Every structure is written in C-alpha cells, then in structure tokens.
C-alpha cells in the first residue's frame, strides 16, 4: 500500500453507500482529508463525476443480450404420474417448479432459526377444527365456542408455543372462533355429516399412461339435499371466484371432482352443490352457479395439461404468463427469472 501510495498519481476511493445504507468514513480517511486541507489541497475538486463514470464502466458490458429462459425437457418416464391439487396450480402457473421439485427433487432447506409464520398459525387452526369436527360430525353443540377455545389452549400447550407468540396469536384465535361459530350456526342446519382433513384422488388415461390427481380437503360436507359441499379454510388470502372460474385456483374444483367421482373414502359419488372458501375471521366466498360446467372445464384443463406434458418436446418453462406467475417460488433463482425477464432495452 505504501509503495502504491508513493506513485505519481494515485486515486483513493471509498463506498459512500452499501446496499443503500450510508457508510461512515474511517478515522484514517478523515485524518487524510484534514492533512490535505491543511496543505491547501482542493478536496472538493477531486469529487468529480468522471470517477463515478469509471466505476460504472467496471461492470458495464459492451453488448446487452437478453438471455433465454430455461426450457428443460426431461424424458417422459422421469415426469411425475401423480400430482397433488396444490401442485397442479404451480403446474399451470409455473411448470419449472414441477421440474425442480418433482423431477430434480430439490427442496429448500429450512432456516436454522426459523420464526413462526402465518402458515404455522394456519396449522393450529386446521388441527383444532379437525379435532372439533371429528367430535361433532353431525351436530353443532351449544357450547361450541368454549370447546373450540379449550382445544386451542390444549394445542398451544402441547406444542409448547412460546408465550410471546401466544400473546400475539391468541386474540386472533379468539376472533376466528367468534366468526366461525357464527358462520356454523347459519350453515350447519344444511349439513348431514362433516368429514375433516379427508384424502382422495381420481385417475384418467393420458398418452403415457395412467395419471392420478390427489388432494387433502380441509372439509367435505354431506348436505341434507343429498349433495356435497367442499370447504377450504383460509387464514390469509382467499381466492376469488374469477380465479377459480378462470382455472388459476384449481384446488377446490379438483376436490369437487374427487367428490363427484367418488374418490373420497366412505363418501359415495355425489353431485357437488357448492365450493366454499372460509376466510376465517373475515368472510365467506361461495361458488355454486353452473357447478357442473365449472367442474367439467376443470377436468378438461387437467387432462389437457397432462396430455401436453406427456410429450418429451414439451418443456417445463418458467412463468409462461408473468401476470399469472405464483406469488412466491422457492425455485425462481434456479430459473434465473431476473436475468431473462429483463427486456432488451433494460440493463
């Protein structure tokens, strides 16, 4: 450093910001400025735009070329023959997720010190409601609120939920229970029997052979009019009717198809009456118009999707329609989305 500093012309530079955060000058740097000022040097004149231009040129490419998105085409025998309802949505919105997760079998590692999230709160709600509905599949007791709150206390205690987390979540849980009890009082008279956290599937023939769609429904209700209602609990964002009808939220229609085909254990093939989102603590979204047409279109989309991907020339491209891309993906960096999604006129 001393030898370099003794050269005829020396440029000393420092970062004023790192990732947007202002950086404090080092004591040595401030001492150097003081000495230069004492010698009468024009420090202000050294801070010229030319230096910034030189810095920009370090990472500047002579030619900007838009990179193509990945287009993996694994052999058909390596492609999945069983798909869950939640995976079907990713299949529609971002096929690359299916390639990375189910063909390459890559899985994101958990954080070493992972905080509890809204997903964990949702797990609590599902566990409490499953236990309650299994106790009361054909009735709704007068003391339902007290029983649900007691089940919640038991879950928090058994799973050793930290007191600070409990203090934050418990008021929300109480609010959810209040909303749920009100909704159930209006809804349960229509229900003959409730089935909670029930698994099911249906299969069809695709070009490369049998293909199976699976799902685990939060709730499937046999109603007094001889039909089936399917309910999906949501502690966060609930899907809109438009998303469901457009095919971009296929989970409930898939569960409806399983019910229609008799794919849930101990529930005979039955006409589907309603698909329902319960955004717990907030609102209810009911889909019941043109139900047979909705389910038929959903079935056609799934069969078409499986048929298209049964040909090796079909690539698992990433985000074919950016406007319908998933809100979050563990594999976006592997697909290099930020590289190829930049337009040719951007740097």
Kindly label every feature range from the protein language model:
Residues 1-42, 234-236, 241-243:
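Conserved C-terminal motor-coupling region of P-loop helicases
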Residues 12-13, 73, 77-86, 105-115, ...:
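Glycine- and acidic
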Residues 16-19, 27, 34-52, 146, ...:
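Metal-dependent nuclease catalytic regions and adjoining charged, substrate-binding loops involved
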Residues 30-131, 194, 322-323, 327-336, ...:
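C-terminal, charged and often intrinsically disordered regions of DNA end-processing helicases
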Residues 80, 88-96, 113-124, 144, ...:
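Secondary-structure capping and boundary motifs in well-ordered enzyme cores
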Residues 95-106, 148-153, 221-234, 274-279, ...:
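Active-site-adjacent bridging/hinge elements
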Residues 124-205, 289:
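A non-catalytic, helix-rich entry segment at domain boundaries
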Residues 195-263:
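Non-catalytic protein-protein interaction segments used by genome-maintenance enzymes to assemble
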